[in-house]
Amino acid sequence: MYLDTAIIVKLLVDEHDTDYFQNALAGALLSSSELAFTEVRAALLTKERNKLISASQRDAAWQVFTDRVLTRDIDLHPLNGLVLRKANHILWRCHPTVPLRTLDAIHTAACDLSQDFPLCTTDKRMRDAARVLGIPVFPEDQPS
């Protein structure tokens, strides 16, 4: 199962749907892009700046993430030219129906190239793009 960064963050810090995703993803083979390494750090720093987590919670969440990557509990696929070219193709394919953002296109491309389906995301644009491309999404019942 390919996780977008927002889902990874839900596994690291308490959000309204953290329990749901922790239970739903327990025991699944998880992957993402190397892009998540930078995006997770940025998301944790944003949560700290917005006073949603403390510095110690930020550090603990980062440690859990890096441990999960090092143990390959979350496998990070390389970010390379092939992924970027695929993301460019996805942007073109989804236009004008789905106004996909650049980093979301990169995640969608990495998911498609790795074939680590389904794409686990709650982002409406990513879910809509995945449907255009025929990529299975999770959770299935999330409104788009």
What are these regions (language model features)?
Residues 6-7, 35, 124-125:
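Alpha-helix/helix-capping structural signal
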Residues 118-121:
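Short, hydrophobic beta-strand segments that form beta-sheet elements in well-ordered domains
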